[in-house]
Regions:
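Alpha-helical transition-metal enzyme core signature, strongest for iron centers
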Residues: 17-28, 47-61, 65, 105-112
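Conserved alpha-helical segments that form or flank metal/cofactor-binding pockets of metalloenzymes
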Residues: 36-78
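Acidic/histidine-rich alpha-helical segments that form the ligand environment
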Residues: 63, 80-124
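Helix-loop segments that flank and shape redox-cofactor active sites
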Residues: 2-9, 24-49, 111-124
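Disorder-to-helix initiation segments
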Residues: 1-17, 94
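Short alpha-helix boundary/capping motifs
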Residues: 6, 49, 56, 75, ...
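N-proximal short alpha-helices
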Residues: 16, 20-27, 34, 70-74, ...
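Conserved acidic
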Residues: 13, 39, 46, 97, ...
Length: 124
């Protein structure tokens, strides 16, 4: 077993995951607040469940970044600059909210796969 040496690639990938996770969290919360229509109750609850589960996951990743000796990204402005996600319109339809969040979550999964691969390559 080789010794683990944190690489800039791992840290950069994890920092991107934090930024994009915060973007998904914020957009999910906006959808939670603004959803309307016949699916209101089910979507309102689903959006709340998602953003509630995202926060502790983001915290865990940020703490891993610190454990690797780097600083976790902070500040909403900085996170917004780092995030590579489109914003959701506040007045989006419920259907558009679901489509948007589905695409945002798929992009986040791709970031997570990249971070996993970088960590694996580094022996983490």
């Amino acid at each position: 077993m080789k010794n683990f040496e944190p690489s800039d690639k791992v840290i950069k990938a994890l920092r991107q995951v934090v930024a994009n996770s915060y973007a998904v969290l914020g957009q999910t919360q906006i959808c939670h607040w603004n959803v309307r229509g016949s699916s209101f109750f089910s979507l309102h609850s689903a959006f709340e469940a998602q953003y509630t589960e995202l926060f502790p996951a983001i915290d865990e990743i940020a703490e891993r970044i610190r454990a690797l000796g780097a600083f976790a990204p902070g500040g909403l402005g900085n996170l917004a600059k780092m995030a590579g996600m489109k914003e959701i319109r506040e007045d989006a339809s419920a259907q558009d909210m679901v489509k948007h969040l589905s695409a945002a979550n798929n992009a986040l999964v791709a970031d997570l796969v990249s971070a996993r691969d970088a960590a694996g390559d580094a022996g983490d």
